[in-house]
């Protein structure tokens, strides 16, 4: 058992999960791309807008941070897609492929139970969908000591 622990610590990379909305992806950029009529129609439930996720831009520094973390860690994208918006699931896949490359699509996990994934770190801007119960360290993106990607990289690259 001790040998297995030593093997994992020395040989295997630590696992990092990265959320999409509000962490890799600027959700507000999708809202800004909507017409005024769409904004009024979907007020308070923008995650229900068809194709909303395909209209979003990366957060500042997110692409570089993902690539840098991938050099040191075993990085996965762990996100949630709304149940009532069927296009959200495929939009998220296409966003990952278009912004991070096809190899990253094989590291995309969509789940409403993030706490079921085993890893060392979860970078997420919320505690919902199991993020608050994650067994590793929750890096609360956009809050406190982790307001942006620069602060996350400083912490994880130390």
Residue positions per predicted region:
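Short, Lys/Arg-enriched N-terminal segments with co-localized hydrophobic residues
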Residues: 1-11
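Active-site neighborhood of HAD-like aspartate-dependent phosphohydrolases
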Residues: 12-54
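Conserved Lys-Pro-Asp/Glu-containing loop-to-beta segment of HAD-superfamily phosphomonoesterases
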Residues: 15, 105-133
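Short catalytic/ligand-binding loop motif for oxyanion handling, primarily in non-cytosolic enzymes
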Residues: 25-28, 77, 84-88, 116-118, ...
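Substrate-recognition element of Asp-dependent hydrolases with the DxDx(T/V) motif
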Residues: 57, 62-90, 96
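Active-site donor-binding segments of glycosyltransferases and PAPS-dependent sulfotransferases
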Residues: 86-114
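Acidic, Mg2+-coordinating phosphoryl-transfer loop and its flanking beta/alpha structural elements
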Residues: 121-153
């Amino acid at each position: 058992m001790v040998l297995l622990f030593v093997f994992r610590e020395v040989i295997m990379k630590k696992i990092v999960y990265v959320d999409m909305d509000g962490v890799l992806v600027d959700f507000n950029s999708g809202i800004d791309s909507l017409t005024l009529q769409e904004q009024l129609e979907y007020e308070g439930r923008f995650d229900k807008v068809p194709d909303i996720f395909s209209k979003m831009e990366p957060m500042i520094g997110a692409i570089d941070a993902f690539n840098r973390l991938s050099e040191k860690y075993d990085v996965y994208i762990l996100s949630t897609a709304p149940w009532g918006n069927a296009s959200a699931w495929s939009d998220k896949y296409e966003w990952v492929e278009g912004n991070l490359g096809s190899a990253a699509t094989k590291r995309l996990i969509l789940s409403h139970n993030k706490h079921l994934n085993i890893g060392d770190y979860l970078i997420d801007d919320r505690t919902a969908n199991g993020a608050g119960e994650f067994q590793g360290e929750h890096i609360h993106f956009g809050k406190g000591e982790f307001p942006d990607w620069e602060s996350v990289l400083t912490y994880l690259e130390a």
